[in-house]
Design a protein with these regions (language model features):
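Donor nucleotide-sugar binding/catalytic pocket of nucleotide-sugar-dependent glycosyltransferases
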Residues: 142, 147-153, 157-176, 243-297
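A short, well-ordered alpha-helix in the C-terminal region of glycosyltransferases
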Residues: 439, 453-468, 474-483, 494-497
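Nucleotide-activated donor-binding/catalytic signature segment of Leloir-type glycosyltransferases, i.e.
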Residues: 353-377
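N-terminal subdomain of nucleotide-sugar transferases
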Residues: 1-152, 489-536
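Conserved acidic donor-binding segment of nucleotide-sugar-dependent glycosyltransferases
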Residues: 430-437, 446-452
Length: 536
């Protein structure tokens, strides 16, 4: 089969998280042909080195700006005029209405496809940044009951600058509609579209399914909608803008879940979130993210002194403050204990990181080696080898793969009972409530004071992670899922090259459901009318 991998990022390398997953998938399924479509890549970007294995082709999004800069030239240039412009503005008006009106959510999908259809041939990004688009957003916010315009005082009152920001951000979100991927030699020729980690990467898959009937599978190792919602907590936008963008990603996720033939979350915890967001439980298959660390040896002998290794982002949701308070109490029981901190401060968290360093210096002022801040670029495995217990105490939940790689070191894990931690760690580690320094102190002291228990839990955790997160079971699962998806899907129409003779009919070349669905496809083509196509 020809598999189109869709990603929101730039071209991933084989060493990056996303590229590493693509590399493992393509190596594990040598019988298939894979092509990578990267929304964040432009024609100026160099090919990744090392590139993921067995990728037949890598496709950029066109222009020079990808998803992060202004497009220029190619399909992005030009303008929309006459009936196409009126159709595009009518579709955009319906799309924005679906975002701001709670009762209009069902109109999101039809408006999205109508907008993409009206923008064929170029000019859509320029129109979506125009004054006409600005007028549509401002008018939508003025309608009674518009989402995001209700709040205490002036919190929900949209300003002109809010409309300017919203139009710009929404245009960037809709830029995949103009990617040069929808011709007969690209997504139309794929047997399956596989969107990696959801989000905007789903948009090309939705259009390929809508236009060509290409089946879609969505893989989310961390729920994209949930991460977006967390990210917008500290975003520098006022409430009307945040509400509009969150509504877009929520409705995009719902449309993707409803149109996908199969959905593969990385944990049962994410599966529950997906069902809550509109996914059909029958379409969901949990596939744990494989990691090559499963084939490597464990960490070996423990350090001579009782040592904890903390991992996570040095930010309020990472839990380092809780860890330091717990470690201060632990030092009263184990004065020789050492804490090794491995993480870096994300953008905007520099002040928090500095306060954590000041607090760490107060824990043992006469012993500067009691708390060690590791180089953020150090390999996690190297940090695990220097500890007897690995601790994750963030409030936002640690990625299952990160927990699994810590367990694969053979060290016992202490983690806060949030997210997928209970599912991943199971009975092989200790779970504590979030933001509870006393419980964290007790768990760490219990393990550091019992070498036999540390060894038993560490070995059990390694075996559990090897069973769940080995590479081969993940590849085997996708081999079966691709076959399951294609076997139950009507085949696409054959792509005919210009000037070529019609292909001869192949007996039994298509399943019976293709011919049954052909009539309904023709009926939909006759009945489909673009939103307000005759307006103006």
């Amino acid at each position: 089969m020809r598999i189109a991998l869709l990603t929101e990022s730039a071209f991933p390398t084989a060493r990056s998280v996303e590229g590493g997953w693509c590399d493992r998938l393509t190596r594990g399924l040598p019988e298939h042909e894979f092509e990578l479509y990267a929304l964040g890549a432009t024609r100026r970007d160099p090919m990744p080195e090392p590139r993921p294995a067995r990728l037949a082709a890598l496709h950029h999004s066109g222009g020079t700006g990808g998803l992060s800069g202004l497009p220029a030239g190619g399909r992005f240039g030009g303008g929309l005029h006459g009936p196409r412009r009126r159709r595009a503005l009518a579709a955009y008006r319906a799309l924005v209405g679906a975002l701001v009106q709670p009762a209009g959510a069902d109109g999101f999908g039809p408006a999205l496809y109508a907008l993409a259809d009206a923008g064929r041939g170029g000019g859509l990004p320029a129109l979506l940044r125009s004054g006409a688009a600005l007028d549509i957003v401002e008018a939508a916010w003025r309608t009674p009951g518009a989402r995001g315009t209700v709040g205490p005082g002036s919190v929900g009152e949209p300003l002109v600058r809010d409309a300017l920001v919203a139009v710009d951000l929404l245009e960037r979100c809709l830029r995949p509609l103009s990617a040069p991927w929808y011709g007969p030699d690209a997504l139309a020729a794929a047997d399956v579209c596989h969107a990696v980690d959801g989000g905007l990467a789903v948009l090309p898959g939705l259009l390929a399914k809508h236009d060509h009937g290409t089946p879609l599978i969505i893989t989310e190792h961390s729920l994209h909608l949930r991460e977006r919602a967390r990210g917008y907590r500290d975003a520098p936008y006022r409430w009307p803008v945040r509400a509009l963008l969150l509504a877009f990603f929520r409705l995009l996720a719902r449309e993707g879940y409803q149109q996908a033939g199969l959905i593969t979350p990385g944990s049962a915890y994410d599966r529950r979130w997906q069902i809550h967001c509109g996914a059909d439980p029958a379409a969901i298959r949990v596939v744990y993210e494989g990691t090559e660390v499963a084939d490597r040896p464990g960490a070996g002998a423990e350090p001579p002194v009782p040592t904890l290794a903390w991992s996570g982002p040095i930010a309020p949701h990472g839990g380092l403050g809780t860890m330091l308070r717990a470690f201060a109490d632990l030092r009263r029981e184990l004065p020789e204990a050492v804490l090794r901190i491995h993480g870096e401060a994300p953008a905007g968290a520099g002040g928090y990181a500095e306060r954590c360093r000041e607090l760490a210096a107060l824990i043992a002022p006469k012993d500067p080696d009691a708390v060690v801040f590791e180089d953020p670029s150090a390999e996690p495995g190297a940090v695990h080898r220097q500890a007897g217990v690995v601790v994750f105490c963030g409030t936002g939940g640690t990625a299952p793969r990160v927990l699994a790689e810590a367990m694969l070191s053979g060290r016992p894990v202490v983690a806060t009972d949030v997210g997928a931690a209970r599912e991943v760690v199971g009975p092989t580690g200790l779970l504590v409530p979030a933001e509870d320094p006393r419980a964290l102190t007790a768990a760490c002291a219990a393990l550091l004071g019992d070498q036999e228990r540390r060894s038993r839990l560490g070995n059990a955790g390694r075996l559990r992670a090897q069973e769940l997160y080995a590479v081969e079971p993940a590849a085997t699962a996708f081999r079966a899922l691709y076959l399951e998806l294609v076997s139950g899907w009507p085949g696409p129409d054959p792509v005919r090259q210009a000037g070529a003779a019609p292909a001869a009919r192949q007996p039994f070349g298509r399943p019976a459901d293709y011919w049954v669905a052909a009539g309904s496809r023709q009926a939909r083509a006759r009945d489909s009318v673009p939103v307000e196509a005759g307006a103006g």
